[in-house]
Amino acid sequence: MPAGGRAGSLKDPDVAELFFKDDPEKLFSDLREIGHGSFGAVYFARDVRNSEVVAIKKMSYSGKQSNEKWQDIIKEVRFLQKLRHPNTIQYRGCYLREHTAWLVMEYCLGSASDLLEVHKKPLQEVEIAAVTHGALQGLAYLHSHNMIHRDVKAGNILLSEPGLVKLGDFGSASIMAPANSFVGTPYWMAPEVILAMDEGQYDGKVDVWSLGITCIELAERKPPLFNMNAMSALYHIAQNESPALQSGHWSEYFRNFVDSCLQKIPQDRPTSEVLLKHRFVLRERPPTVIMDLIQRTKDAVRELDNLQYRKMKKILFQEAPNGPGAEAPEEEEEAEPYMHRAGTLTSLESSHSVPSMSISASSQSSSVNSLADASDNEEEEEEEEEEEEEEEEEGPESREMAMMQEGEHTVTSHSSIIHRLPGSDNLYDDPYQPEMTPGPLQPPAAPPTSTSSSSARRRAYCRNRDHFATIRTASLVSRQIQEHEQDSALREQLSGYKRMRRQHQKQLLALESRLRGEREEHSGRLQRELEAQRAGFGTEAEKLARRHQAIGEKEARAAQAEERKFQQHILGQQKKELAALLEAQKRTYKLRKEQLKEELQENPSTPKREKAEWLLRQKEQLQQCQAEEEAGLLRRQRQYFELQCRQYKRKMLLARHSLDQDLLREDLNKKQTQKDLECALLLRQHEATRELELRQLQAVQRTRAELTRLQHQTELGNQLEYNKRREQELRQKHAAQVRQQPKSLKVRAGQLPMGLPATGALGPLSTGTLSEEQPCSSGQEAILGQRMLGEEEEAVPERMILGKEGTTLEPEEQRILGEEMGTFSSSPQKHRSLVNEEDWDISKEMKESRVPSLASQERNIIGQEEAGAWNLWEKEHGNLVDMEFKLGWVQGPVLTPVPEEEEEEEEEGGAPIGTPRDPGDGCPSPDIPPEPPPSHLRQYPASQLPGFLSHGLLTGLSFAVGSSSGLLPLLLLLLLPLLAAQGGGGLQAALLALEVGLVGLGASYLFLCTALHLPPSLFLLLAQGTALGAVLSLSWRRGLMGVPLGLGAAWLLAWPSLALPLAAMAAGGKWVRQQGPQMRRGISRLWLRVLLRLSPMVFRALQGCAAVGDRGLFALYPKTNKNGFRSRLPVPWPRQGNPRTTQHPLALLARVWALCKGWNWRLARASHRLASCLPPWAVHILASWGLLKGERPSRIPRLLPRSQRRLGLSASRQLPPGTVAGRRSQTRRALPPWR
């Protein structure tokens, strides 16, 4: 076919004989799509002439590069026509219909890759040998005719019903060898194909390499380098060594065969004819290997289909539980055709299998030569999008031009553009769907502009007016031309204003897009950091789970060993008891036997036979008694053994349960710590995001203010120019009117009182216009008044448009200003005047020659209604506006966007003003259950007597401490529990204070006296000073003024000279008490901000050292502490497990600390048990005294039940997208389940 021919043309006889003239839709029926690829779709069909099952490959040659597609189709058809071999796919014919080629071929069951997909495991070596042998025979046939397949892989090796192996998919094949084109599938490509563009040609040995890769694919379910990118795989194939089989259980023949196929140098690689003589393919194997493999695959597919059908049937019955049962078989028959999978062997009937596939459409990667269609489609889409964007940009101007045309008619065809998705997949979903022939869309002729048409009409008028008589004067024509030029200037001015606004809007959009990109990058970085932390947490959790599992297995093995030892011990004891019993029975039997013999000897008259019988009966009785005794012993031993085993198992089960509880508690503590660390990270990320958004908001506001300033300056300049021009016109008009007045009227106007100014249509007249005024008569005063009234009536429309400073406008000017500018209206109810007299005083402007401040200028331009909206916006966003004004931002009106871009801004924006706040902003959520009611301990009114007693006791003890310092520890121990409780002392606080005091005293003594060798007297003095400072600080913090007063009174009585220092200390303490909270809050916030800017590792270390308090975090982020939604301080949980045996002093201190913690826990649990056993009246008394305190509910975030979470999710999904909540759900992040 000539290169310049049209695609689908059959004028060439050589091309026409390749295709049949019949209609394929009439020849083939029951078409079902069974595969898809970049080339098109593959269909299962049945020939109506002979009921033969065939495979139809539909390929479209329409669209871009149709000639190249047509040439590929012709090449493939010619290639298939030449094939005559049992191991190649058989060609049935090719038909053309509606720019689609129907390539009809022999139908096969499927490909070798389908076998891997169905069985989910590699093939056996015998099966690989059979498949390879058949493929080699087909390749040998191709190579003997100088043909190259160039796309050999498991997906292109097909299996037929009789068990034959066939080569398929010759779309990449080459009719001539050698070849030099870059064609094939990347992972199966030979090195010489990859390097063909640089190093030259290649021959049929490239198929041998691909066959070796296919063997590895059949043996390992995927080709080498399959987990790598396609381009990287090509580089590795060309540069690295040849791949090999990974597993070691394959035979040496198979390994040698694969190594021979994968020789890197083509000259060392054997041909297909040589490989047919290899021992791997010539070894003895059952002749029904392929048939057995196909049958086994059919059975597996049938089972999968039945399972899928049962699942679908179950789903259908669940959706329609009342459906009739008689329709089940019909539903089964209808559901089975839709359960086929492209690339798998499928069974439609239980007796025999109907194939599902003919051509390889299930390979995991497409060929390289098939990527051109997708790229062409993508380029076509990009070009169409660019054309649409250009049309959208030119749209408003062209519409304006069309509106300005007069006397001319244009016909425009608005044809819709059909978009095609990348690739031609969707073109073949319906075989009966006609396809449209795309043709180049002819753009309509550009309409002539209004300027050219008006200038042409003017030139025609000028040419014709010389040949025709006219009554129009030259001055009238010149004035009309001048007015038209003025209108054109105004129109051009408005066009420039529109272009400026559009440019400003684009600049704002570009800035917002850039800032949005920064936010997305920042969000992605924070998300990666969070995911990395979560991955670390997951690794730690897995390690902990493995350790717990190892501990559990170890304990189970130890328990089993102990149980066996225990059973063996009991069995040994019982065996000894049984042996002793048997020994005793033997002795008793001998003694009894001797006694019986003696008794027989004493009575000699008894016959011998009777003696023997009597002796036998006595022996039997004795043996029976011994047997019963032995059976009773065995029964007792068995009962004892069972009882002991049950008791031991119970004991071991309790121990295992306790171990499981400890492990579970450790796991929960670890998870709580991880959640707290994650919460801290999220808080830090929130702070960083807030700062970024603040900076971006400042940048946007600065840009918006600058653009608004430029816009206002332009508007002001245009308005001043217009006002100057109108003032000049009015002066000329007024001068002409004055010149036309009679002299008597001028004299009358000059005789007016000095205090009464001469008024006109526009208010006070200028002084320069009345230089020639003379008195006028009273009769002409009425005429002047009527003229002035008429001028005022003419000025009314202009006042509604421009204010009181202008005069009347022509109707054409009103139309231009009202329609094109879009900011004025002739209705006084809709808009106020744009320019007011007192704000836009031209004389004052000319005298002062300065521009008013921008804020007042904006408010004057906006008008009263816009100023009211401004005030409303200020009320709604008062805090933000105040902060912006403090930062120096100039607030301006939001630029009116271009009409084409309004919808995009509304979609990109957040929730509108007035949207209700959700739990993510700190508000309570309806999904969270209410807190449990307070316990009965808080319901009793607390008695005031213990409070007075405690304060009096502290005051008296403080007075005593002033005289005797030995009572200072007692005062500190009493003060600590009183400070720990809100309404008085508590038992738990007292125990804690005692423990803290003793441990602190002991640790300080060991450190100072033992390590630093401090003298005991100095240590005692230091301990007293520390205790005194602690007493004063604690009493000052809780407001217990009795303690310092008692100490001061005692010291004054002992040392009167301390009065002045004590007074100074009291004054300083009062000032510190007043200013202390504010200073502490400021220092705390500064400290927290410094910590939040540190790296996560340092921040985590400081958390472990308790350098970050939850009170400070919640003060810095108050939304996280609303309505009880707060988390605990993220401090890492102490490391569990046995401590290392070392003799370091710190290790000894750690052991002592662990021992103290253990005793503290035991003491607290004993106190809790004791309190639970007390009667209610005793609990009430102890609670009123402050010795007991009710347990507070945990403020750790609670996880909602799964049902409530699903209800919340379903409710949020059922909301329509147009509602406020729906819009907010589209823009806001989903709430965590515990919120």
Swiss-Prot record:
Region (Disordered): 318-457, 892-941, 1210-1235
Processing after translation: Autophosphorylated. Phosphorylated by ATM.
Biased composition (Low complexity): 350-374
Gene Ontology cellular-component annotations: actin cytoskeleton; axon; axonal growth cone; cytoplasm; cytoplasmic vesicle; cytoplasmic vesicle membrane; dendritic growth cone; glutamatergic synapse
Comp. bias regions, Basic and acidic residues: 396-411
Acidic residues biased stretches: 375-395, 899-909
Gene Ontology BP annotations: actin cytoskeleton organization; axonogenesis; basal dendrite arborization; basal dendrite morphogenesis; DNA damage response; focal adhesion assembly; MAPK cascade; mitotic G2 DNA damage checkpoint signaling
One GO MF term attached to the UniProt entry: neuropilin binding
E.C. designation(s): 2.7.11.1
Cofactor(s) demanded: Mg(2+)
Class of enzymatic activity (EC top level): transferase
Pro residues: bias regions: 926-935
Protein kinase domain residues: 28-281
Active-site residues (renumbered): 151 (proton acceptor)
Activity regulation statement: Moderately inhibited by staurosporine, a broad-range protein kinase inhibitor.
Keywords noted in UniProt: ATP-binding, Cell projection, Coiled coil, Cytoplasm, Cytoplasmic vesicle, Cytoskeleton, Kinase, Magnesium, Membrane, Nucleotide-binding, Phosphoprotein, Serine/threonine-protein kinase, Transferase, Transmembrane, Transmembrane helix
Biological role stated in the UniProt entry: Serine/threonine-protein kinase involved in different processes such as membrane blebbing and apoptotic bodies formation DNA damage response and MAPK14/p38 MAPK stress-activated MAPK cascade. Phosphorylates itself, MBP, activated MAPK8, MAP2K3, MAP2K6 and tubulins. Activates the MAPK14/p38 MAPK signaling pathway through the specific activation and phosphorylation of the upstream MAP2K3 and MAP2K6 kinases.
Summary of subunit composition and partner proteins: Self-associates. Interacts with MAP2K3 and MAP2K6. Interacts with tubulins. Interacts with MAP3K7 and interferes with MAP3K7-binding to CHUK and thus prevents NF-kappa-B activation. Isoform 2 interacts with PCDH8; this complex may also include CDH2.
Family note: Belongs to the protein kinase superfamily. STE Ser/Thr protein kinase family. STE20 subfamily.
Protein name: Serine/threonine-protein kinase TAO2
Organism: Rattus norvegicus (Rat)
Lineage: Eukaryota, Metazoa, Chordata, Craniata, Vertebrata
Gene this protein is translated from: Taok2
